[in-house]
Amino acid sequence: MAQTEIELDGLLAFPLTPFTEDLEINLDGFAENVESHIAAGAGALFVACGTGEFSSLSVDEVAALLAKAREVANGRVPVWVGAGGGAAGARAGVAAAQAGNADGVLLLPPYLVTGPQDGLVDYVRYAVGDTSVPVIVYHRSTGVFTAPTAAKLLDIPSVVGIKDGYGDVETMTRIVTTIRALGTQRSADFLFFNGLPTAEVSAKAYAAAGVARYSSAVHCFAPEIAHRFHRALAENDDATMDALLAGFYLPLVALRDETPGFAVSLVKAAARLRGDKVGTVRPPLIEPTPEQIDRLGKVVENGFAVLKGL
């Protein structure tokens, strides 16, 4: 697939993975979740990724989620899927994504160990193998790339972009500038994404660095707010962005930062507050306390009040 065929415009959604009371995947609930994202206007779906609790899922569960998402989407939006972890698992995941007709793969970092820069490129190359499914490399955690190393990813034909979850704008600016400066069609087409938790908080800074695309966890429970912010960013509407940041996103981040893992747990809790059947999180993530859920409800309520006043 030529890189110019990659369609990842608009707001990128990362569906939650619903679980039953005994923490088995709930495919019926997942189908409803996928449909709600599409109906709300998601530009693409990334299933079984960070927000979808990839680290807690088995290979068979990821395959089942991909198949269900493709069935529900029925070609209306692109469906990407997560892969990663240990080298063998990452390779198997990419191969399974291609076999399952995924539109692409978000390749998560190596599991547990941190290798040198050349080792990171080798990890991506090994994971990709002889597949041709498009791959976006997640730059975070045990997989943080320098700009020269990131440029080497362009030697792997199916790698079409980098998603930043590391959070260093200077590093990402170096990566974007280094790749664009190569002056080839390949480097001009290469895609960059802001993949930080609650990416709206850093969206203006990243857009200024040439990274306007981002994923929105808020789309899981308040797509109306997520789309209004996304439109404001595209229109350079600082007043709207600042109002939503002050009245909703920053209070949400303050609550999120109270407990490790709340970048996922709070999203699931907020989705439940809005009536979605997503269940709880798998360990080692934990659920918010009743007091935190009460505060979460007030944050979401205030967010919609701000939205109404715009």
PLM regions: where:
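A general structural signal for well-ordered alpha-helical segments in protein cores
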Residues: 62, 66, 90, 172, ...
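Generic alpha-helical structural context detector
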Residues: 13, 231, 268-272
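Active-site beta->alpha loop and helix N-cap motifs at the rims of alpha/beta catalytic domains
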Residues: 2-145, 286, 310
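Conserved, mostly hydrophobic/aromatic
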Residues: 23, 37, 69, 127, ...
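C-terminal extensions of enzymes
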Residues: 259-310
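Catalytic alpha/beta core domains of metabolic enzymes, predominantly
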Residues: 141-252, 256-260
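A non-catalytic, amphipathic alpha-helix used as a structural packing/dimerization or gating element
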Residues: 29-36, 60, 64, 68, ...
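Alpha-helical structural signal in soluble globular domains
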Residues: 40, 64, 68-73, 96-100, ...
